[in-house]
Amino acid sequence: MKVLVINAGSSSLKYQLIDMINESPLAVGLCERVGIDNSIITQKRFDGKKLEKQVDLPTHRVALEEVVKALTDPEFGVITDMGEINAVGHRVVHGGEKFTTSALFDAGVEEAIRDCFDLAPLHNPPNMMGISACAEIMPGTPMVIVFDTAFHQTMPAYAYMYALPYDLYEKYGVRKYGFHGTSHKYVAGRAALMLGKPIEDTKIITCHLGNGSSIAAVKGGKSIDTSMGFTPLEGVAMGTRCGSIDPAVVPFVMDKESLSSREVDTLMNKKSGVLGVSGISNDFRDLDEAASHGNERAELALEIFAYSVKRVIGEYLAVLNGADAIVFTAGIGENSASIRKRILTGLEGLGIKIDEEKNKIRGQEIDISTPDSSIRVFVIPTNEELAIARETKEIVETEAKLRKSVPV
């Protein structure tokens, strides 16, 4: 089976074509600047051969048409026609409370995705554009929707409810949803294998640390708490997001700076985090460099980030009553030894000890804890595309079996 995985953003369309026989990508591509001038498509084949083309991409549909051309290109492509693709898996950020698992796309699923536009106005609409384009260009090919929020729907009510008037939840769905669920689920599964234990018997803290960061407490393979909330703004400090702050800061700053609700939202989402504190960058590599040359605000930004992650790890050790493993994943979690060290230093009293030399290894699956560490510390590269492809394959094959078992 070949599965096309699509992640449609507001001005981008990422894709991978994965051969599920050996779970390897045949092609990885990206359409950039969709709906903007100077748009481009790049595609890298399994053998390293690369296509790069500047082409007008006014809509997601046109972008997907270019993806079809790239995948079937006589020189750079990997298939002869789109009929070789057995299924399509789409990443959708928000599934609300309706979806606890991935779902085969139909009219009801489309309606539910649209119902969540208010909850994820920056993400669900472009996600839906990608789905609609795919339905037009590849009619008859089954599509599976994999929701970022689904994995966290196992949280108990006392973990996901806010102490606000209950009717705000009933009327508007105001509660914690959590995000990065596909990544948290994938690395928790890998961690269980590294522990050599059935996932049902594990307690794992997963740290997805990138420009957007979230942490999850995973017990028996199920999310029981996570740091992001109603939106991806809650939780730890991030690249450009402030993370959790005293809510009273919002009206105070609005009054003092004469900001609208939209402007203060932009301030907290786009101008805060380590960028806002440092005044330099949201790229942690730039901050590391600046801090090493004595920039105090860069150092402060890194310390705020590391402390916020450390604090949540401590919370989740209490929530889980201990842990078998702590996992670091995503761009920063996988590649920044210095950030991992900042986060874990001072946790030795909780049985968390890392090997300095192993911690220097970047971007590969490894146990970086010492032999006497009572809690294992793993670095596990995430693979959300493969996770989406696996879910897609499973759902499509299950649906096919069900159809065969129904008498005509």
Curated annotation (Swiss-Prot):
Its cofactor is Mg(2+); Mn(2+). The active site is at residue 148. One of its GO terms (biological process) is acetate metabolic process. GO terms for molecular function: acetate kinase activity; ATP binding; magnesium ion binding. Pfam families: Acetate_kinase. Mg(2+) binds at residues 7, 384. Substrate binds at residue 91. It is found in: Cytoplasm. ATP binds at residues 14, 208-212, 283-285, 331-335. PROSITE patterns: ACETATE_KINASE_1, ACETATE_KINASE_2. Keywords: ATP-binding, Cytoplasm, Kinase, Magnesium, Metal-binding, Nucleotide-binding, Transferase. Catalyzes the formation of acetyl phosphate from acetate and ATP. Can also catalyze the reverse reaction. Homodimer. This is Acetate kinase.
